A protein has these predicted regions:
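Bilobed periplasmic-binding protein/Venus flytrap-like ligand-binding cleft at the lobe interface
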Residues: 58-66, 165-192
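A bilobed periplasmic-binding-protein/Venus flytrap-type ligand-binding module shared by bacterial periplasmic
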Residues: 43-48, 87-88, 163-176
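Extracytoplasmic ligand-binding site segments that recognize negatively charged/polar headgroups
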Residues: 1-126
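A ligand-binding cleft/hinge motif common to bilobed small-molecule-binding domains
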Residues: 1-3, 131-149
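Alpha-helix capping/helix-boundary segments
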Residues: 121, 139-140, 192
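Loop/turn elements at helix/coil->beta-strand transitions in domains of secreted/extracellular proteins
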Residues: 68-72, 98, 128-131, 148-150, ...
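Periplasmic-binding protein-like
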Residues: 38, 102-107, 114, 146-170
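Structural recognition of the beta-strand scaffold that forms the well-ordered cores
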Residues: 34, 41-43, 71-75, 131-135, ...
Length: 192
């Protein structure tokens, strides 16, 4: 949204439904409207951890355990917003040099490849192909609600987040602006 705003492709519109949303999660320029916050977490296959007796990770450094060699799945930050958020989080928490050192160590525990997108990660952990996926909390929680042997764990030493948003496109057909505003109001409401 920031790039679209800077390119002048979005029109300022702030839904009246945002009165209960803290300003820290809103766009200072009033262009995009927040609709959710997604925090990074570890989606862990409880069957795998019970079978191996390996402790479930509680912090980022736990992912470096030799017991998790080849058992972590994540997407590449080149194409995945989830993994880009992971990279940015680690840089903010540890500083750039220490973050890259950490990622080199983590790479030793990542399975055969990095996926292009994070959409498949929870499925791979749900079916037992891997023990841990680094994903957004809502993706892991969905697997829990669907009955998979998943436990969602937030890193105790801190984590990153994304703000999902929606915005009004500039120069949309004049007759559709009112409908678009109504939709944005619904998306930012408790019902949306």
């Amino acid at each position: 949204y920031i790039q679209l705003r800077e390119a002048g492709l979005l029109e300022a519109y702030q839904s009246p439904e945002l009165t209960d949303v803290p300003e820290a999660y809103q766009d200072e320029q009033g262009v995009w409207n927040p609709i959710y916050i997604g925090t990074l977490c570890f989606a862990c296959n409880t069957d795998w951890f019970a079978r191996t007796g390996t402790p479930m990770p509680t912090c980022w450094d736990d992912l470096l355990s030799p017991a998790l060699a080849g058992q972590i799945v994540m997407a590449t930050p080149k194409s995945s917003g989830t993994s880009y958020t992971t990279l940015a989080t680690l840089v903010q928490m540890r500083g750039e040099d220490k973050a890259w050192e950490y990622l080199k160590k983590l790479d030793q525990n990542v399975g055969a490849y990095y996926t292009a997108s994070s959409t498949e990660l929870v499925k791979q952990v749900s079916t037992g192909d891997y023990a841990v996926a680094i994903v957004f909390y809502h993706d892991g929680r969905r697997a829990v609600l669907d009955g998979y042997p998943i436990e969602v764990r937030s890193p105790a030493d801190g984590t990153g987040y994304e703000i999902g948003a929606c915005a009004l496109v500039r120069n949309a057909p004049a007759g559709e602006r009112e409908n678009a505003c109504t939709f944005l109001d619904w998306m930012t409401s408790a019902r949306g």
